[in-house]
Amino acid sequence: MTAPALSARGAYRQILRATRIAFHEDTRVLLAARQEARRQFDEHKRVGIDTPMQINHAIEVASILKHNIVQGVKLEGDEAAKWELRIHDDIERGDNDSIKHAGKDIKIHKACSA
């Protein structure tokens, strides 16, 4: 096998692992995510100029699924509509201080139309 084929297989496996982590206990969404991943890989199965970009995209998708997707489950019998979040060990956690200071160092210049 060629190097792109091996790395494409690795990217596909990363997506499968990430979907298992992100959609644990949600079989319907897990199967839909895996079907979509399979469909996307089948659409782009020929090696071409954009193959490395497609592989990189797949790896980024796997990372987002693994580190940034949190599912919520509505608690049964609760009229106030309380939700429980399924936060796993791989979820990226930020603190409020980083949010408060985000973008403060950015200088805004003249508008494009000026």
UniProtKB/Swiss-Prot annotation:
Cross-referenced CDD domains: Complex1_LYR_LYRM7 (cd20267)
InterPro entries (UniProt xref): Complex1_LYR_LYRM7, MZM1/LYRM7
A molecular-function term among this protein's GO annotations: protein folding chaperone
Species of origin: Aspergillus flavus (strain ATCC 200026 / FGSC A1120 / IAM 13836 / NRRL 3357 / JCM 12722 / SRRC 167)
GO BP annotations listed: mitochondrial respiratory chain complex III assembly
Annotated localization: Mitochondrion matrix
A cellular component annotation (GO) from this entry: mitochondrial matrix
Name the UniProt record assigns to this protein: Mitochondrial zinc maintenance protein 1, mitochondrial
Transit peptide endpoints, chain numbering: 1-18
Assigned protein family: Belongs to the complex I LYR family. MZM1 subfamily.
Subunit note: Interacts with RIP1.
Keywords annotated in UniProt: Chaperone, Mitochondrion, Transit peptide
Summary of the function given for this chain in its UniProt record: Assembly factor required for Rieske Fe-S protein RIP1 incorporation into the cytochrome b-c1 (CIII) complex. Functions as a chaperone, binding to this subunit within the mitochondrial matrix and stabilizing it prior to its translocation and insertion into the late CIII dimeric intermediate within the mitochondrial inner membrane. Modulates the mitochondrial matrix zinc pool.
